[in-house]
Amino acid sequence: MLRVFIFFVFLGSGLAGRIKPQITCKYFISENNTWYKYNVTILNGTIVLPAYNMIPTKAAGISCTCHDIDYLQKNNISIHYNTSILKTFQDIRIIRCGMKNISEIAGGFGKELKFLDLRYNNLQFIDYNILRKLIRSNTPTYLYYNNLMCGKRNCPLYYFLLKQEQTYLKLLPQFFLRRISFSNNNTYLYHFLSCGNKPGHEFLEYQTKYCRTKFPEINITVNQLITKKNTERYKNCYPFVLVSILCSCISFLFLIICLLRSICKKYSCTKQGKSTHKYIPLIPSYTFSLKKHRHPETAVVEDHTTTANSPIVYIPTTEEKKASCSRRK
């Protein structure tokens, strides 16, 4: 009986070793800031993500989470997806799905992408073009608990991390893998390195020098990325800048015209007030004719005798004017 029992124990353990653990995955679709649960199709170890006929037309985000999958990739899982659908999402979360290559979903990164969570997968390299897209869009990205390796293909990532470290990189010590994180406001990028005995900062400097020495053609990738990002950002503002400059020029010209008009008006009034012309006050019993004469003393007395009932036009002398002024005082 003991031998039979031992035989069945070994047989059961052998069968258990051959049976793959049950993989349970679920994904959620975000619509109107609410996450709705859907079923995930798994065919021959392949996650069909998402189920095309069950996604709302106004979906804004997708989240896929798998369980019973070792994030160090003992399970060989691949992902199939619909790129045209993923491009419409602002929020993409594929967690613990055993993804080996980010290019499997990078084709679905559209301009609307505002958040990316790829934790607990088996990513080994971050492709340069994908990193460039994430940097330009300033997309908050979670990459920790992956298996990112050393080598030429990750050199742009080292440059990027080292450049960020100058201002806001925080190093967290780990016993096994070096965890390197940087944070900038709401943007986070966590990176696990599976090689090197040095602390995170020293390793980044060492690896960056290695990349610069062995692969000088990648030496300015991050600077180029940031420059292109700023250039593209400012290109969108060019029409507004031109309109602002034009409006400023018109306003400045209008102010100059108003200022010149006020100066001219003030100058002409001042000149008129300082004039040496002597105007004769009107006396009710007389009418003076000043036609074609600037000075009343030289005015010619007009003859109105030919006209009936015409008043006599008389030019008073200087003494009479003085006497008239004294009487008025």
UniProtKB/Swiss-Prot annotation:
Disulfides per UniProt: 195-237
Keywords, alphabetical: Disulfide bond, Glycoprotein, Host endoplasmic reticulum, Host Golgi apparatus, Host membrane, Host-virus interaction, Inhibition of host innate immune response by virus, Inhibition of host TLR pathway by virus, Late protein, Leucine-rich repeat, Membrane, Signal, Transmembrane, Transmembrane helix, Viral immunoevasion
Induction description: Expressed in the late phase of the viral replicative cycle.
Membrane-crossing segments per the record: 240-260
Signal sequence annotation: 1-31
Extracellular side: 32-239
Glycosylation site residues: 32, 39, 44, 76, 82, 101, 185, 219
Gene Ontology BP term (one): symbiont-mediated suppression of host innate immune response
Ranges facing Cytoplasmic side: 261-329
Gene Ontology CC entries for this record: host cell endoplasmic reticulum membrane; host cell Golgi membrane; membrane
Primary localisation category: host cell
Membrane topology summary: Single-pass type I membrane protein
LRR repeats: 112-133
Localization terms from the record: Host endoplasmic reticulum membrane; Host Golgi apparatus membrane
Processing and modification events after translation: Highly glycosylated.
Family note: Belongs to the asfivirus I329L family.
Domain notes per entry: Contains putative leucine-rich repeats (LRR) and a C-terminus cysteine-rich capping motif similar to domain structure of host TLR3.
Function of the molecule: Viral TLR3 homolog that probably prevents TLR3 dimerization and subsequent induction of IFN. Inhibits dsRNA-stimulated activation of NF-kB and IRF3.
The protein's name: Transmembrane protein I329L
